[in-house]
Amino acid sequence: SGVRSPLELAGCENAALTQSPVTTGNPTQWRIDVIKVPLAAPETASVVSQPRIFTDPATGAFNGLQNTLPGALHPSGTAYSPLPNTNTCHDVTAFPEIGLLAGACQGNGILLDISDPVNPVRLDQVVDKNFAYWHSATFNNDGTKVIFTDEWGGGVRPRCRASDLP
């Protein structure tokens, strides 16, 4: 799916997916929105920060994680790329008691320090060439492990047979 049009939601800036470093503008991709929701007045919820959690610390490129343009289709012919361009998160799971958030973000699994929830910091990221699309992130009960799942291995079209190519 694409980013909303600025005509639909003010402030949306859609950037083209590219392998060149993106370091200017304010594209809606390559960030998350941190939203504060007062429990006593949820109607006053507001975006309090928009951290660029995919940024390459060495270059400052917003698109600093897996940055591969779509590749070959799955042998079934479905339009899924085994080389996603990491520009959004599909699923994030917070474990506030230990100050961590795990994200399944298209081509990467990420771990964020949320001890300061308004200003999360990426601690680490992983990539697995056998994952087509990082789908979900779940902590174990004590928060010492994160389990990531792949869209192809679950969701609406599981592909877990030996004959299925990664």
Q: PLM features: residue spans?
A:
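Feature marking well-ordered beta-strand scaffolds used for ligand recognition
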Residues: 1-166
